Amino acid sequence: SDDPKESEGDLHCVCVKTTRLVRPGHITXL
């Protein structure tokens, strides 16, 4: 949607899943 908060939430989800695979000790997305 056009809601910035929704977009940030989606990106955070993807980032957390990705970083968990690459860096198990680092689960933020950023």
From Swiss-Prot:
Post-translational modifications reported in the UniProt record: Binds non-covalently to a proteoglycan molecule.
Originating species: Oryctolagus cuniculus (Rabbit)
Compartments, record wording: Secreted
One record GO biological process: adenylate cyclase-activating G protein-coupled receptor signaling pathway
Any one GO molecular function term: CXCR3 chemokine receptor binding
GO cellular component: extracellular space
Known function: Chemokine released during platelet aggregation that plays a role in different biological processes including hematopoiesis, cell proliferation, differentiation, and activation. Acts via different functional receptors including CCR1, CXCR3A or CXCR3B. Upon interaction with CXCR3A receptor, induces activated T-lymphocytes migration mediated via downstream Ras/extracellular signal-regulated kinase (ERK) signaling. Neutralizes the anticoagulant effect of heparin by binding more strongly to heparin than to the chondroitin-4-sulfate chains of the carrier molecule.
UniProt entry tagged with the keyword Mitochondrion: no
Identification of the protein by name: Platelet factor 4
